[in-house]
């Protein structure tokens, strides 16, 4: 999308032109660096511990082989699982995955994967705005985020993978948060009282993260085994 819009605006000068495109002031070369090379490098570095395993270390120079291996692992899960979920449950943030809940190092600890209850729903409102803005106001950046989110979600009900989990929502939710970020930026540019929704949304989002942080970070929990009930707002999260 970035390349197409730059080419449309500047033709042969698209590589170093700063005008046009979904993000004004950024050249195509800069976009390739910050949106391409840097994320790929950080992704590669996230495997650093695996490069140094004593047994079966990951080959650092075969990243495509990592993806192939992970796909095989994903496709190998075919039996029902207590934490499996469906795509529409991800949208509603109705299901969670527990990775840990037991006593570790003398304290009760837990690690649960769940979406931020506030931002997940705020993102859906922003998705509707992004679609409207993309069509009505030619906000191609917002429209691109919205269409990409929808495209990533549509493939799951059509997928042949029988067992699905909420972590499959990580990529679509990234574009959902992109819609939210652009929506908040649009609110902040207003000159009326609605602009103050932007800091309010940010404050609530951060507050919600802080509230759930102990149960997603393996922090020591007070209250023993029943401690997790403090964060279980929905029965389906248990």
Task: Please describe what each predicted stretch is.
Residues 1-8, 171-174:
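Hydrophobic transmembrane alpha-helices of multi-pass, membrane-embedded glycosylation machinery
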Residues 103-139:
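Hydrophobic, aromatic-rich transmembrane alpha-helices
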Residues 120, 136-148, 193-201:
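Membrane-interfacial loop-to-transmembrane alpha-helix junctions, especially the N-terminal start
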Residues 163-185:
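Hydrophobic/aromatic-rich transmembrane helices and adjacent perimembrane loops
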């Amino acid at each position: 999308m970035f390349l197409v819009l730059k080419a449309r605006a500047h033709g042969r000068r698209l590589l170093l032109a700063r005008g046009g495109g979904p993000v004004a002031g950024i050249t195509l070369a800069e976009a390739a660096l910050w949106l391409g090379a840097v994320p790929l490098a950080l992704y590669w570095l996230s495997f650093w511990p695996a490069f140094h395993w004593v047994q079966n270390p990951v080959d650092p120079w075969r990243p495509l082989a990592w993806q192939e291996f992970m796909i095989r692992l994903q496709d190998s899960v075919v039996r029902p699982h207590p934490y499996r979920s469906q795509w529409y449950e991800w949208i509603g943030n109705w299901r969670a995955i527990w990775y840990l809940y037991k006593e570790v190092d003398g304290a009760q600890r837990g690690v649960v994967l769940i979406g931020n209850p506030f931002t997940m729903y705020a993102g859906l409102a922003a998705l509707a705005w992004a679609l409207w803005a993309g069509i009505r106001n030619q906000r191609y950046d917002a429209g691109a985020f919205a269409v990409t989110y929808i495209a990533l979600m549509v493939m799951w009900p059509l997928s042949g993978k029988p067992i699905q989990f909420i972590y499959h929502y990580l990529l679509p939710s990234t574009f959902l948060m992109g819609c939210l970020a652009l929506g908040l930026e649009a609110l902040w540019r207003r000159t009326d009282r609605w602009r103050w929704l932007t800091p309010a949304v940010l404050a609530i989002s951060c507050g919600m993260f802080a509230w759930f942080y102990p149960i997603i970070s393996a922090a020591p929990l007070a209250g023993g085994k029943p401690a997790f009930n403090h964060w279980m707002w929905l029965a389906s999260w248990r």
